């Protein structure tokens, strides 16, 4: 019975998250999706730690559905890989805390070249 309860708990949590998304999605959601759909460059995902794993999966999913994308590890980015990002790209930075220094340190460069 323990496995069934776990499945019910996890499924309930996921359903609640979807309900929350439906309730809270607004103009920001529409704007973000529109930017990605109309991107003339690549969609680049960036993160460190567990956020890096999520970014890799997102990049692979986007690429498999026809959206040019790739992942850049934020630590590697600040040590030379930022040159892969172009002004026509959209860069999605992923951080659980929002304060990961490696990720935060990339923001200035990304803005300077005009990437969104």
Regions found by a protein language model. Give the residues of each.
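An N-terminal, well-structured beta->alpha segment
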Residues: 2-41
């Amino acid at each position: 019975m323990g496995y069934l309860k776990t499945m019910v708990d996890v499924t309930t949590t996921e359903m609640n998250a979807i309900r929350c998304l439906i309730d809270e999605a607004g103009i920001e959601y529409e704007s973000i999706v529109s930017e990605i759909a109309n991107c003339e460059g690549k969609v680049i995902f960036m993160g460190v730690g567990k956020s890096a794993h999520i970014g890799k999966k997102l990049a692979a999913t986007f690429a498999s559905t026809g959206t040019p994308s790739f992942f850049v590890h934020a630590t590697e980015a600040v040590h030379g890989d930022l040159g892969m990002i172009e002004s026509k790209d959209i860069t999605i930075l992923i951080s659980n805390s929002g304060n990961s220094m490696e990720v935060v340190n990339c923001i200035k460069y990304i803005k300077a070249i005009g990437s969104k």
